């Protein structure tokens, strides 16, 4: 239900903004991003608990459409930051596809970020969804608590399954599954198949990101619902 409400905001925003989409957020302070902030487990990092990163329209473009911060936190996400000996829930569980608003530097296969990639389509307006179609493009998903940082979720396209890589990790706290929403407004629960997709949360920044995951069917499944190669 939370994801469906977030996805509704993603659908409403371009109606009020010349068809332009929000950006996913790659730095925590990116102008035009759906949310602000950078999450980790550092007790001195205010972003972990500062709901203004979600509710202040200057920081979060979804803010005018979602008046409560609770929508951004999946009830199954039990991660926390310890401050002064007390446990505090962090404010957000979801990440947005880097193909939504770009720049999409993690999309091309390989081990590094390609800031000016021109191979894969970036969706900057809702009218861009016509190919491959909005029902085939994921927008938001539950992200692994030890993977989440800025608002964007990075995953890589797959040209050779044997060279597939996992950049960020999805959550699997729904009995090995994650909630995921699509550009047409529908949401579903995706059951992951490969154990490499589902490392147990450690409530720490110890999870290695951007790792080889050859022939991982989950990496391939998500890539098939991320974007397509440019045709021009």
Outline where the language-model segments fall:
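Short, well-structured segments within or immediately adjacent to enzyme catalytic domains
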Residues: 3-232
């Amino acid at each position: 239900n939370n994801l469906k409400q977030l996805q509704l905001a993603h659908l409403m925003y371009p109606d009020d903004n010349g068809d332009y989409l929000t950006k996913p957020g790659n730095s925590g302070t990116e102008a035009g991003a759906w949310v602000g902030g950078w999450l980790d487990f550092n007790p001195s990092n205010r972003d972990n608990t500062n709901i203004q990163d979600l509710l202040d329209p200057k920081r979060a473009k979804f803010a005018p459409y979602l008046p409560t911060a609770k929508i951004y936190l999946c009830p199954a996400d039990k991660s926390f930051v310890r401050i002064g000996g007390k446990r505090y829930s962090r404010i957000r569980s979801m990440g947005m596809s880097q193909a939504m608003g770009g720049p999409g530097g993690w999309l091309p296969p390989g081990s590094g970020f390609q800031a000016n990639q021109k191979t894969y389509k970036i969706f900057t307006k809702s009218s861009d969804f016509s190919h491959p179609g909005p029902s085939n493009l994921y927008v938001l998903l539950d992200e692994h608590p030890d993977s989440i940082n800025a608002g964007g979720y990075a995953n890589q396209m797959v040209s050779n399954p044997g060279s597939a890589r996992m950049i960020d990790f999805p959550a699997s706290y729904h009995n090995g599954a994650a909630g995921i929403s699509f550009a047409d407004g529908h949401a579903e629960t995706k059951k992951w198949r490969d154990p490499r997709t589902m490392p147990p949360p450690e409530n720490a920044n110890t999870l290695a990101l951007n790792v080889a995951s050859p022939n991982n069917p989950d990496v391939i499944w998500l890539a098939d619902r991320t974007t397509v190669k440019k045709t021009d």
